[in-house]
Amino acid sequence: MDAKNTTSRNGTAAPVHKHRGIRHLFAAASYSFGGAKRLIGEAAFRHELIAFAVAMVAFMIVGANLFQYVAMAILFLLMMAFEAINTAIEEIVDRVSPEISEMGRNAKDLGSFACLCLILANAAYALYVIFLARFLG
């Protein structure tokens, strides 16, 4: 396969259309929104989204400051990015190696572990802000 072609999911080759300038910006945004739409299809992401909403409500109740909201939002954006990467890893492994293999399982487990680390970081920070405000504020 040469640089001008790519293989679609059904195995057929289609030409790659490279956009330039402002059209490239809009195309890139379209791809990003497509990724976000795909990510919303993941149950784990929807659970993380609900947890973020609950944390934001809790932050309002305890009177968190702007810095704490921004830090929580940044942690959540990182978690979204890791969840997207993990989903991409899972899709690639499933496409390349539909049979169960140790390497494929390890790749999926490592991606899942990365997500778990960010979930724990988000939870720890949210609990820190909530309890710090409640007991020291």
From Swiss-Prot:
The cofactor required is: Mg(2+)
Q: What is its EC number?
A: 2.7.1.107
Principal EC category: transferase
User: An example of a Gene Ontology BP annotation on this entry?
Assistant: phosphatidic acid biosynthetic process
Tell me where on the tree of life, at the top rank, the source sits. Answer: Bacteria
Q: List the Pfam families hit by this protein, alphabetically.
A: DAGK_prokar (PF01219)
Topological relation to the membrane, as annotated = Multi-pass membrane protein
Catalytic activity reported: a 1,2-diacyl-sn-glycerol + ATP = a 1,2-diacyl-sn-glycero-3-phosphate + ADP + H(+)
State the CDD domains in the record.
DAGK_IM
Q: What is its main location?
A: membrane
**Where does it live in the cell?**
Cell inner membrane
Alphabetically ordered keywords of this record: ATP-binding, Cell inner membrane, Cell membrane, Kinase, Lipid biosynthesis, Lipid metabolism, Magnesium, Membrane, Metal-binding, Nucleotide-binding, Phospholipid biosynthesis, Phospholipid metabolism, Transferase, Transmembrane, Transmembrane helix
- Provide a Gene Ontology MF annotation, just one: metal ion binding
**Chain segments annotated as transmembrane:** 45-63, 69-89, 113-133
Q: What are the positions of the active site?
A: 83 (proton acceptor)
A single GO cellular-component term from the record reads: plasma membrane
PANTHER family for this protein: DIACYLGLYCEROL KINASE
Record's family? Belongs to the bacterial diacylglycerol kinase family.
What is known about what this protein does?
Catalyzes the ATP-dependent phosphorylation of sn-l,2-diacylglycerol (DAG) to phosphatidic acid. Involved in the recycling of diacylglycerol produced as a by-product during membrane-derived oligosaccharide (MDO) biosynthesis.
List the protein's name.
Diacylglycerol kinase
Origin organism of this chain?
Rhizobium meliloti (strain 1021) (Ensifer meliloti)
Q: Which gene encodes it?
A: dgkA
